[in-house]
Amino acid sequence: MPQISRYSNEQVEQLLAELLNVLEKHKAPTDLSLMVLGNMVTNLINTSIAPAQRQAIANSFASALQSSINEDKAH
């Protein structure tokens, strides 16, 4: 069941496009892109979430990420 977001699809898509443009501008390979994005998530959690909630937020994020992974074999 999809979650309802307080953000519009337009807001999400615009920010996603801008982030992808930065990665493409720097010709970042997939592994570097994932490393940088992972570090960004870690930094956001550590600087914006109360310590008592960080583990739960990280677990929720990891679960949502795993649920969104496409299983088809196309590369």
UniProtKB/Swiss-Prot annotation:
It comes from the Bacteria. InterPro entries: UPF0352, YejL_sf. Coiled coil: none annotated. Belongs to the UPF0352 family. The gene is yejL. It holds the Pfam family DUF1414. This is UPF0352 protein YejL. Transmembrane segments: none annotated.
